[in-house]
């Protein structure tokens, strides 16, 4: 499926379904500093509301109240684009080159600011793009700076960005892992949807100048004492017949709930893919499954 420059802007709901949603996510992971970040607007135009979560986290600072910065805003007015720029509660996205290059800034005066340039390293990976529903992912290089109450930290890392639009119920039952690794020469994305009676895999392997869809992937997980994924190996194959084995270990973690329907452990991972890559392992649970799992620990 293909995109055009209009897909970099907000989409018009095709139904009056109140849970019709649109997200516009940017992220970064900088192995030199150990810092990861996320900028996550969630729009529900049929309800005329929006939400925003901005977070930066580091090793051993894994909660919203111990992270260097974490703030969520709810019940905001949905933003609109004015030319190539949209603004939402201190966050600004400027489209410098549609589908390829962006200027991301954030201002929480006297507390935290971000000034980042995000450049696509490859074409968008597009599982679906219709007026009714869409999703795509793009590996990026992220360069710029963060400022924590006067302390400036340079950022030079990688990130995935994604866009989604269409109905998204807060009452969905979901168990997902969203996993990626990126360097200047390639990237991979492995998305596992784990249902009670099925397990589906999607994503891609982009290596040696060739991108191909992943057709099989099995993961072997190690967890720490807090049940966070600490190490994982993926073994599988892609549509071109290439077999792969990719192993990574966690550098940091953040307990994050950016929307009512999903909780995730967001973890920076360093991978042995393509002579070294960085990315994230996002361990995603809907609240019902998380509650069931946690209740098993009751005595």
Identify the role of each PLM range.
Residues 1-299:
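Structured soluble/peripheral alpha/beta segments that form catalytic or ligand/cofactor-binding pockets
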């Amino acid at each position: 499926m293909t995109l055009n420059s209009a897909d970099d802007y907000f989409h018009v709901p095709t139904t009056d379904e109140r849970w019709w949603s649109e997200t516009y996510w940017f992220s970064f992971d900088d192995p030199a500093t150990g810092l990861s970040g996320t900028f996550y607007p969630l729009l529900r135009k049929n309800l005329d509301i929006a939400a925003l979560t901005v977070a930066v986290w580091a090793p051993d600072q894994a909660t919203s109240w111990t992270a260097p910065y974490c703030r969520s805003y709810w019940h905001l007015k949905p933003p609109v684009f004015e030319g190539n720029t949209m603004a939402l509660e201190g966050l600004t996205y400027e489209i410098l080159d549609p589908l390829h290059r962006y200027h991301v800034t954030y201002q929480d005066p006297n507390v935290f600011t971000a000034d980042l340039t995000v450049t696509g390293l490859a074409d968008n990976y597009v599982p679906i793009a219709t007026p009714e529903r869409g999703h795509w992912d793009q590996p990026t290089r992220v360069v710029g700076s963060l400022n924590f109450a006067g302390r400036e930290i340079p950022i030079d890392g990688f990130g995935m960005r994604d866009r989604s639009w269409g109905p998204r119920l807060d009452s969905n039952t979901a168990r997902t892992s969203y996993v990626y690794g990126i360097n200047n020469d390639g990237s991979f994305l492995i998305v596992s949807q784990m249902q009670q009676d099925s397990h589906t895999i999607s994503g891609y392997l982009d290596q040696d100048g060739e991108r191909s869809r992943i057709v099989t992937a099995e993961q072997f997980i190690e967890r720490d004492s807090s049940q966070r994924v600490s190490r994982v190996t993926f073994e599988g194959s892609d549509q071109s017949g290439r077999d792969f084995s990719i192993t990574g270990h966690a550098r940091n973690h953040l307990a994050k709930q950016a929307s009512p329907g999903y909780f995730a452990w967001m973890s920076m991972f360093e991978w042995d893919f393509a002579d070294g890559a960085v990315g994230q392992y996002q361990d995603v649970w809907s609240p019902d499954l998380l509650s069931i799992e946690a209740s098993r620990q009751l005595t």
